Amino acid sequence: MKRKHKRLLFVLASFCAAGCALLFILSELRESVSFFYTTSELLSGPQRESNLPVRVGGMVVKGSIARSTDSISFDLTDFKTELNVVYSGMLPPLFGEGVGAVVKGRLLHGKFVADEVLAKHDEKYMPKKYTAPKSSPEPK
């Protein structure tokens, strides 16, 4: 085989290997992308009939949080449609009425059974242990 043909074969093999690696990386990233549906999209789309886990985001409706001995239920809204969510587990500290939340789970018999609840916050949020006290005396 001539040197020119060996070089061409090496370049083609390199491109094939790089393409396979890129395809593998993109397929793995696609599964870990963290998007969510709105309540309207979930209830009107094909995800409604699916038994696969999905993420749904919205605002927790004020006055909708109801705690029982083993679970908590609340309504999520995108200000068009409300979705009843049932969750058993520890809620995040920022969770509350009127707060944005993303839930991951399945829609079963008109209720969304959540496996995970995430509370959303704005870009200015700082944990209390990292914020400075408001009434600190100024140095003289």
Curated annotation (Swiss-Prot):
Keyword Methyltransferase: no
One Pfam family from the record: CcmE
Gene3D superfamilies: Nucleic acid-binding proteins
GO molecular function: heme binding; metal ion binding
Superkingdom classification of source: Bacteria
GO biological process, one term: cytochrome complex assembly
Transmembrane segments: 8-28
Membrane topology: Single-pass type II membrane protein
GO cellular component term of the entry, any: plasma membrane
Alphabetized UniProt keyword annotations: Cell inner membrane, Cell membrane, Cytochrome c-type biogenesis, Heme, Iron, Membrane, Metal-binding, Signal-anchor, Transmembrane, Transmembrane helix
Stretches assigned to the Periplasmic side: 29-140
Family: Belongs to the CcmE/CycJ family.
Record HAMAP family: CcmE
Biological function: Heme chaperone required for the biogenesis of c-type cytochromes. Transiently binds heme delivered by CcmC and transfers the heme to apo-cytochromes in a process facilitated by CcmF and CcmH.
Protein name as it appears in the record: Cytochrome c-type biogenesis protein CcmE
Organism expressing this protein natively: Anaplasma marginale (strain St. Maries)
